[in-house]
Amino acid sequence: DKVSVIEEFNDALKESVAETSEEFMERFFNGEDFTYAEMAQGLRQGVRELSIFPVLCGSAVAGMGSLMLLDNIMELLPSPEQGNYHKATLADGTTEEFVVSAGGVPTAFVFKTISDQYGKYSFVKVLSGSITPDMTMVNARTGDNEKLGRLYTMRGKKATEVKELVCGDIGAIAKMDKVKTGDTLCDSRKVVALKGIPFAEPCYSVAIAPKTRGQDDKVAQGLNRLNEEDPSFSVVNNAETHQMVLSGAGDMQVDVLVSKLKTRFNVEVELSPVRVAYREKIRKTVQKQGRHK
């Protein structure tokens, strides 16, 4: 029944909390219960050590679980200043702990990209110092200087222009054409590269082609723009089968990409199975006489 299921998960939660300290572990084996404050303390410690990953349920459409999510973020997640779990690679190749600091040199991490026919937005979280429009920063991946465009804070689809983003802020920078998701923008006084975002290898492939002849370049351009937003899929032109092969996590991701090509880039495509380029191996040499006409 439901009660037994709840008790089972509650016991698993207590065991996870007990593993965060020797004191809690001893009390757990002695059969003692934890108070609410002690449970919260253990969860905070586990989250900070990346040994506990809370999962919450809710629905933004139905308005369910939003307050619970915010309360748990405030109570369980460490603040950026408490975390200090960012690994940074310096220009000389050595690594160090990156310290989040409002008074440090400006550093921002690009965690998302949105690109459409009207332009490109690079979403960043400022991890140190502050950034302003027209500031010149270094892209740690390329070593190039990047002049920042206009800065925005996003609320849904509404973009509000701001004059500054400070440490801890999440915002968007316009027209950063050479910047990709996972890049670190930093001050020239201290060039650091934070660990990028790992993406799973694509495991599902289909051939993609335009419904209207002559729109291959338009399809390729649209997929390249979408790949800036979602690097988890790949596009390869197979020279042997003469097919454009789209690879992703599954058919749902492919369907979303096809829909975006139609709505945002005004190009319709059709999908087909990937052709296999069969090969035969020469196993041995033989001598044969014959007449060639």
Model-derived segments and their meaning:
Residues 1-293:
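Structural and coupling elements of P-loop NTPases
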